Amino acid sequence: MKRFWACLCLCCCLCAAPLWSFAAAPAGNTGTYEVTELWTGDVLTASFRMGMCFAADGKLRGVVLLRSSNGQVDVYHVYGSVQNNTFSATHGSGHKITGRFLPGDDVEVKIRLGNGMRFTTVARRFRDVPLTDDCAPLPETSTHQQD
């Protein structure tokens, strides 16, 4: 019986990877339309740029570029959902981003790291911006730069 459950768990894990790949497919490949946004802001001594793609069914996917004070850039691909005025997205490492859309061009972003540390910040929101196929922000030399 233990072997059965182990095999079942292994099959579920192997089957989950293609599902995430399909969810992360570019909007043009799936035939669905996505709204794109760029969020920029600071948290502690780092700055971030988030490319976010929202589908009509409430799914979101995005890429977070976190630039530390020494210039190193870490990249995080996140997946989640939007409902009403709130959103939630997770990274495979256990990091979680939640928050709400504020009036105007701001979004409240709450970050919970996999180790439990929490941060809250307000990001500036740019709507209908070009992003890469995987929703990553374009290089900072493009038209939407962080202020």
Residue ranges and their predicted role:
Residues 1-4:
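Positively charged n-region of N-terminal signal peptides that target proteins for export
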Residues 6-7, 129:
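General helical structural elements
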Residues 7-17:
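Bacterial N-terminal signal peptides
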Residues 16, 21-26:
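Boundary at the C-terminal end of the N-terminal hydrophobic targeting segment
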Residues 24-102, 108-146:
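Central antiparallel beta-sheet cores of small beta-barrel/beta-sandwich binding domains
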